A protein has these predicted regions:
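Helix-loop-helix hairpins and the membrane-proximal interhelical loops
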Residues: 1-46, 145-194, 212-215
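Interfacial loop-to-helix junctions that mark the boundaries of transmembrane helices
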Residues: 1-7, 109-121, 175-181, 221, ...
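Hydrophobic core segments of alpha-helical transmembrane domains in multi-pass membrane transport
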Residues: 8-21, 53-57, 125-137, 150-162, ...
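Short helix-coil transition sites and intra-membrane helix breaks within transmembrane domains
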Residues: 24-28, 57-65, 166-167, 195-204, ...
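Hydrophobic alpha-helical transmembrane segments of multi-pass integral membrane proteins
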Residues: 42-69, 185-208
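Membrane-embedded alpha-helical segments of transport systems
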Residues: 57-66, 85-102, 119-125, 155, ...
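Membrane-interfacial helix-loop connectors
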Residues: 69-91, 95, 99-121, 159, ...
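Cytosolic, long alpha-helical scaffolding segments
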Residues: 79, 105, 218, 244-250, ...
């Protein structure tokens, strides 16, 4: 084997791994996090969990990616450990699809149909189409499709390069002796495991074995331990990922490890015992790419069928290794203050990570609303317990802003679609508004505290006016949060007219107070408090307007806030004017 053959082999391996990664990334981006959301929601049934694990892994072409995602689910409390077991078992089945794709290189025959099925025939076409779309396509989905096609073509080209590089070794006695050593089950497993740990992909390890099979020097007896070792080696990615995670997440990684170890040892013992008795004829025959795919699939499918009914064994083993603490609640959903749904493992799947950010932002919005409404209810009937809760909620919202902001900045550096980038920008804007609303809640609560400490109260007229104003504020807050949560654009159009009504209420209430002050019906001290509350109300409505405008802008692809606001509130905007008149009449001051 000369230097050029070595370079061809290593170069082919590099292209193979790059093509696999490119295709996998394209598939992940094309799915937009939908596959992960399906995994999260539809795994309550054990059989369904196995099937979904297999399906998702087959699509994204990586069992490691699936198991790491599952570790993230368990760490964040989204998925229980018992539900995770089935997904992990299914992931091992799904990863065998790659071997079947690579086995297409062995298709022979002169018919047009068979020729078209050969990767050497259609890979160049995929590469040409992929490059053309990548260079000319403007839509994100088109570019994702191009990445999938190019990744597949590069993967197949790398496979052919490796096969071509090792083909001359078919006549080498030294090469045959080396491969014969792998027939030793322990050595073969260790080599397969070690190589998989090195390249972090069991699919790639099995693919390289398929490339080596063209020499005819790889027997089935040598291939089996290598395949088994690759299955064990694939568990290291999840184990590494679980470092620093919760105890339950570590258990999920251990479930993957124990499942692969036990199924491998069980299969090896059964195979070698039966082979010693019956002397399987196929064991000494040269392995083929198709044969390797059959072994890989049969082994994993059989293991899933056999162990699924007794999958709780692996869960118990994980609990024996990492015992349950007295303070630990089994499969608990963490307190939202921990924001564990923002798991860094999800950053590898930006679409899903963004969905988790949206969920966290919705929680943040509701905490901010709770703080505001609780503070408003303190006006005229202050109590220390409720005031403490307002402070607690405001601090929680601040924590959310810090955590969410940092997470979104990390997420922004990942490969996001254009739509996801816009949604991320909207989230960054909105969480700032939610945080400011909670700050105004503190201000309102302090005004209520001052009234209580000084035994002050509003006049009956001022109280009636404030009741109307409060109704409008609660309405705009509820509406804007619902707009954010549901992305209801029709409802969003109602926010700006209501904000204009609130501006009018703010100005009118202050004007009326000055009149009462001149007539001696109100004190200057109460005037300051009323003005503070009214100003905070008006500023809350401004933040609600910002939230609704962000959602409307996202839909219209328009990010010039001031221009957009001017357009929708223009004097000739019929819909706006009608809605404004309706709300003005509804929130008429007495």
């Amino acid at each position: 084997m000369n230097i050029f053959m070595v370079l061809s082999l290593i170069g082919g391996l590099a292209l193979f791994l790059y093509g696999m990664q490119m295709m996998g990334d394209g598939l992940k981006k094309a799915s937009g996090g939908k596959l992960e959301m399906i995994l999260e929601k539809l795994t309550s049934n054990k059989l369904m969990a196995v099937l979904l694990g297999a399906g998702v892994t087959a699509i994204i072409q990586s069992s490691s990616a699936t198991t790491v995602m599952v570790v993230g689910f368990v760490n964040s409390g989204i998925m229980s450990l018992s539900r995770a077991v089935g997904v992990i078992m299914g992931a091992n089945v799904g990863t065998t699809v790659t071997a079947w794709i690579l086995s297409m290189t062995e298709i022979t025959g002169q018919s047009l149909f068979l020729q078209l099925l050969k990767p050497s025939s259609f890979s160049p076409i995929l590469a040409i189409v992929g490059v053309a779309i990548l260079m000319t396509g403007k839509k994100e989905k088109q570019r994702d499709g191009a990445a999938i096609m190019l990744g597949f073509a590069i993967l197949m080209f790398g496979m052919e390069m490796m096969s071509g590089a090792v083909e001359p070794l078919a006549e080498s006695e030294e090469f045959q002796k080396v491969l014969l050593m792998f027939a030793n089950p322990v050595l073969g497993m260790l080599v397969g495991c070690g190589f998989t740990i090195l390249i972090q992909s069991s699919s790639a390890a099995v693919g390289i074995l398929q490339a080596l099979s063209v020499t005819g020097a790889v027997t089935n007896l040598s291939a089996i331990p290598l395949i088994m070792g690759a299955n064990v080696g694939s568990t290291t990615t999840a184990l590494i990922s679980s470092i620093g995670a919760s105890r339950n997440a570590k258990r999920a990684a251990l479930v993957h490890f124990y499942f692969n170890i036990i199924k491998t040892v069980t299969f090896m013992l059964l195979f070698y015992c039966f082979n010693a008795i019956f002397h399987f004829a196929f064991a000494s025959e040269p392995a083929t790419a198709v044969g390797i795919a059959v072994i890989h699939s049969s082994f994993n499918i059989a293991a899933a069928i056999i162990f699924t009914p007794v999958s709780s064994i692996f869960e118990k083993m994980a609990y024996l290794t990492i015992p349950k603490l007295e303070s630990e609640e089994e499969d608990r959903i963490p307190a939202k203050s921990e924001i564990q749904i923002l798991d860094t493992r999800f950053l590898n799947t930006p679409g899903y990570a963004l969905e988790q950010c949206k969920n966290a932002a919705i929680d943040m919005a509701n905490y901010s609303k709770e703080a505001l409404f609780l503070a408003i209810d303190q006006i005229g009937k202050f109590d220390k317990k409720s005031a403490a809760r307002v402070i607690e909620l405001e601090e929680l919202v601040d924590h959310y802003e810090d955590e969410l902001g940092s997470y979104l900045v990390k997420l922004s550096s990942r490969h996001l679609t254009e739509k996801d980038s816009q949604e991320l920008s909207v989230l960054l804007h909105c969480i700032g508004d939610f945080e400011r609303i909670s700050d105004h809640a503190i201000n309102i609560m302090e005004s209520a505290r001052e009234m209580n400490d000084k035994s002050l109260s509003f006049s009956k007229k001022a109280e009636e006016e404030l009741t109307v104003f409060t109704g409008a504020i609660k309405d705009i807050v509820n509406t804007s949060i619902l707009v954010f949560q549901e992305e209801d654009l029709k409802l969003a159009l109602q926010v700006e007219p209501l904000e204009e009504v609130i501006d009018h209420l703010n100005a009118e209430i202050k004007k009326r107070h000055i009149k009462r002050l001149r007539k001696g019906k109100c004190t200057i001290e109460m005037g300051f408090i009323l003005s503070d509350i009214s100003t905070n109300y008006e500023r809350v409505s401004d933040h609600c307007s910002n939230i609704a405008l962000c959602l409307l802008q996202l839909n219209e692809d328009n990010f010039d806030t001031h221009m957009y606001q001017e357009n929708i509130s223009a004097s000739d905007n019929k819909d706006f004017n009608e809605e404004y008149k309706r709300l003005r009449a509804h929130y008429q001051l007495p």
